[in-house]
Amino acid sequence: MLTYETWEENVVSFSEEDETKGALSVLNWAYEEYKDEIVYACSFGVEGMVLLHLINQVNPSAKVVFLDTNVHFQETYELIQRVRERFPSLNIIEKQPELTLDEQAKLHGEKLWESNPNLCCKIRKILPLEKSLVVEKAWISGLRREQSETRKHTKFINQDHRFQSIKVCPLIHWTWKEVWRYVYKHSLPYNPLHDVGYPSIGCEKCTLPVGDGGDSRDGRWAGKMKTECGLHYQ
């Protein structure tokens, strides 16, 4: 088994000639390699809808973890319910932070997402995922190279130094148009905020719509010199 400790570069290769640009091949390998010791960390963005559909074909009882920061958009919570109905056999786990919002405010002040967004992300996203991955050998992410400058070198299989794990990224070669083409082709549910200028959707407190021609992550932590929550350490 390929693990963080036994990491070898390019130990496995995948054909990218099929309709999914290698995504199904990657997922088949991942679930064969890690069995029940792999989890998909899903934010329920549009890429997530594609991956959930593909994962359901490969492993209908796969584990999916959603990092519930308690400050997501209502539309996101409603989408999760629709996904549960569409893919009832998937094991969707909503992981909560150790601190409630009130406890966080008492310790670090009100609106930590404004005063110290990095700490807020650590408490409400990074630490919960870290705890989830303690019992896993690998995790799946919907990163695409096209999304941002910080993601353009992502590979199918990555040695993840942030969580000392293996990070599997099946959609690295997909374009934004290809993601949406797949969603429409398979009539997949998606967050309606995508239709009103939100290409990337995170917490309600830190996500704004993006103007025409903007980077897909420009609406995340706008004005904070920050475009990543910290889950995807480079």
Swiss-Prot record:
SUPFAM superfamilies: Adenine nucleotide alpha hydrolases-like. Transmembrane segments: none annotated. GO terms for biological process: cysteine biosynthetic process; hydrogen sulfide biosynthetic process; sulfate assimilation, phosphoadenylyl sulfate reduction by phosphoadenylyl-sulfate reductase (thioredoxin). Its EC number is 1.8.4.10. One of its GO terms (cellular component) is cytoplasm. The active site is at C229. [4Fe-4S] cluster binds at C120, C121, C203, C206. Pathway: Sulfur metabolism; hydrogen sulfide biosynthesis; sulfite from sulfate. It holds the Pfam family PAPS_reduct. It comes from the Bacteria. The keyword Cytoplasm applies. The keyword Iron applies. It catalyses: [thioredoxin]-disulfide + sulfite + AMP + 2 H(+) = adenosine 5'-phosphosulfate + [thioredoxin]-dithiol. Its cofactor is [4Fe-4S] cluster. InterPro entries: APS_reductase, PAPS/APS_Rdtase, PAPS_reduct_dom, Rossmann-like_a/b/a_fold. Belongs to the PAPS reductase family. CysH subfamily. This is Adenosine 5'-phosphosulfate reductase. The gene is cysH.
